């Protein structure tokens, strides 16, 4: 947990002259770079306007909302705060439980993408459970399409657990309609499960329109168990993922938005976002 003093210090650290440098990919066709606000969830709760301003000052241009934000303020209030900071909000996360009730909120927020954050553990422990999730995703995908939005699901590592020679992820991709259901690939959790993000982009690029970018520390064994032992987060460029290949392929495959996310940080989150942004500029230059 970070104190208010740490938050302010981190914010000031983020507002360096280096942060005023133009985006390295401004002249490229690379997707806009944004932040998944779960990274700064405590700071958002304490000072939404200040946190959004700090994100914008670093150089990020978009944000993605996290699940519990829909329960804390109206869509109109949240949209105004984001717009006032000079940011856009093309995508938002909502929990599987209660997802049905969030479409109007998402529309009022102006989202292009409505994303289910995860398959609940209560059903994500069997192949039948993933089949049920796939059916639900198709239903939500159809509803999103009717409302002018695109549905997607976000992965962790547990989707890659094996059931009689197949995986939960395989079942989700096989049983969902590509016209209705997109996949928001979280590069970290793919790697944590022992898979390769680049290979996934090659195979499923036609179904990936948004990405989560987070890096993974060296030395940790892969795992498909979603728990504290599977959390080896670090800033983009400070870990083991091959970002040059991932980013180039994402651009080639037509990914539309990329969101930096770091579930936990060892320094103030704004400082971590600054480091990831600076490293991404070098990678994309």
Which role does the model predict for each range below?
Residues 43-54, 97-105, 194-200, 243:
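Short, acidic/polar
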Residues 51-68:
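Catalytic domains of carbohydrate-active enzymes, especially glycoside hydrolases
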Residues 35, 55, 63, 82, ...:
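Conserved, mostly hydrophobic/aromatic
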Residues 64-79:
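Glycine-rich, proline-tolerant flexible connector loops at the mouths of alpha/beta enzymes
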Residues 19, 52, 88-182, 270:
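Active-site acidic/histidine proton-transfer and metal-coordination neighborhood
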Residues 146-240, 247:
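Acidic/histidine-rich catalytic cores of soluble enzymes
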Residues 1-15:
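N-terminal secretory signal peptides and thylakoid transit peptides that target proteins
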Residues 22-46, 54:
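C-terminal segment of N-terminal export signals and the immediately downstream linker at the start
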